[in-house]
C-alpha cells in the first residue's frame, strides 16, 4: 500500500514517532489511530 521508505517518514503528523511499514500496516488493518 505504501512505499517502505515513504512509510518511515513522519508523514502521520507532528508529535508522532516514525513507524515501520509493518507497524503501519497492522495499525491500519486494526483500525486504530496511528498517533
From Swiss-Prot:
The UniProt entry, under Pfam families, shows: Amanitin (PF24112)
Provide this UniProt record's keywords sorted from A to Z: Hydroxylation, Thioether bond, Toxin
Q: Where is this cross-link: 2'-cysteinyl-6'-hydroxytryptophan sulfoxide (Trp-Cys)?
A: 12-16
Q: Which residues carry this modification: 4-hydroxyproline?
A: 18
Q: Where is the signal peptide?
A: none
Residues recorded with modification (3R,4R)-4,5-dihydroxyisoleucine: 11
Propeptide feature: residues: 1-10, 19-35
According to its UniProt record, how is this protein modified after translation? Processed by the macrocyclase-peptidase enzyme POPB to yield a toxic bicyclic octapeptide. POPB first removes 10 residues from the N-terminus. Conformational trapping of the remaining peptide forces the enzyme to release this intermediate rather than proceed to macrocyclization. The enzyme rebinds the remaining peptide in a different conformation and catalyzes macrocyclization of the N-terminal 8 residues.
Role: Major toxin belonging to the bicyclic octapeptides amatoxins that acts by binding non-competitively to RNA polymerase II and greatly slowing the elongation of transcripts from target promoters.
What protein family does this chain belong to? Belongs to the MSDIN fungal toxin family.
Q: Kindly provide the name given to this protein in its UniProt entry.
A: Alpha-amanitin proprotein 1
Q: Which organism is it from?
A: Galerina marginata (strain CBS 339.88)
Amino acid at each position: 500500500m505504501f512505499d517502505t521508505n515513504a512509510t518511515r517518514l513522519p508523514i502521520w503528523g507532528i508529535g508522532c514517532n516514525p513507524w515501520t511499514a509493518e507497524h503501519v500496516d497492522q495499525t491500519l488493518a486494526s483500525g486504530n489511530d496511528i498517533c
